[in-house]
């Protein structure tokens, strides 16, 4: 089995092949995201702690977190699921994935070093690969350089040198995201003002509608009362005429 080991602190990654079954036994029956001591791999790994981050079986199917089995299953996957990238909007597909429990049928196991041991591993912990790009978000730049809210973040942007033959050397900087500028604050104030105007307008319209509704209801009530009074007058008139006719007979 091959072990793909990465060390985030230095940015290095190394693929080693282990043939001894006894060394690999410590990773069997362990689920993804489990932290395991790497001491059985050899004396140079003494004190190291690694986390199982994934792997592939001998047919190339990836391990999927949450699938509690050794074998393969076919799952209906959509956007946002691991082990699947949709080609069209809303597309879903049934894909074969391997369970998250490790065993001898894996061809590659991915490990992440979470605790460094006593000795350095050549090509993994003894060298550092610099990051190509710096942070882009304003809060992350502040965190990197330990800046206060009052400090100007734009002066601390990590610039990337661009060199071309026969041209002046120049640098390129990312556009800072979530940067609080006077323009942003002005837009925020405008949004709040527009929201207040909308609420005020809605209140006024609601009060006008309530007044109009009350007026219409009052008019309807008066009309209904007039109709009732008219009916009563007519009924009393009929009653009086019928009495006079009966008395004449």
From Swiss-Prot:
Gene, per the UniProt record = rps6
The main location is cytoplasm
Gene Ontology molecular-function annotations = structural constituent of ribosome
The chain's disulfide connectivity reads none
Listed under GO biological process in this entry are: cytoplasmic translation; glucose homeostasis
> In UniProt terms, what function does this protein have?
Component of the 40S small ribosomal subunit. Plays an important role in controlling cell growth and proliferation through the selective translation of particular classes of mRNA.
Outline the segment boundaries, as ranges, of region: Disordered.
Answer: 216-249
Q: Which organism is it from?
A: Oncorhynchus mykiss (Rainbow trout)
**PTM comment:** Ribosomal protein S6 is the major substrate of protein kinases in eukaryote ribosomes. The phosphorylation is stimulated by growth factors, tumor promoting agents, and mitogens. It is dephosphorylated at growth arrest.
Signal peptide span: none
Superkingdom of the source? Eukaryota
Name of the protein described by the UniProt record: Small ribosomal subunit protein eS6
Localisation:
Cytoplasm
Tell me the protein family, please: Belongs to the eukaryotic ribosomal protein eS6 family.
Residue spans of biased composition, Low complexity class: 236-249
């Amino acid at each position: 089995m091959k072990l793909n080991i990465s060390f985030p602190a230095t940015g290095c990654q190394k693929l080693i092949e282990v043939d001894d079954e006894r060394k690999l036994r410590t990773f069997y029956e362990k689920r993804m995201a489990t932290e395991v001591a790497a001491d059985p791999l050899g004396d140079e790994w003494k004190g190291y702690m690694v986390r199982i981050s994934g792997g592939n079986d001998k047919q190339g199917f990836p391990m999927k977190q949450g699938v509690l089995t050794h074998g393969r299953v076919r799952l209906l996957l959509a956007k946002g699921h691991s082990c699947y990238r949709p080609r069209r909007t809303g597309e879903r597909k049934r894909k074969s994935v391997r369970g998250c429990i490790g065993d001898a049928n894996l061809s590659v196991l991915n490990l992440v070093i979470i605790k460094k041991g006593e000795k350095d591993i050549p090509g993994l912990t003894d060298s550092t690969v610099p990051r190509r790009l710096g942070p882009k978000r304003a809060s992350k730049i502040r965190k990197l350089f330990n800046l206060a809210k009052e400090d100007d973040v734009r002066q601390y942007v990590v610039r990337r040198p661009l060199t071309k033959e026969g041209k002046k050397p120049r640098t390129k900087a990312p556009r800072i995201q979530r940067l609080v500028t006077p323009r942003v604050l002005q837009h925020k104030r405008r949004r709040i003002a527009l929201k207040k105007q909308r609420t005020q307008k809605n209140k006024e319209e609601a009060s006008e509608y309530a007044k109009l509704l009350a007026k219409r209801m009052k008019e309807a009530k008066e009309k209904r009362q007039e109709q009732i009074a008219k009916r009563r007058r007519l009924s009393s008139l009929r009653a009086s005429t019928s009495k006079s006719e009966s008395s004449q007979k």
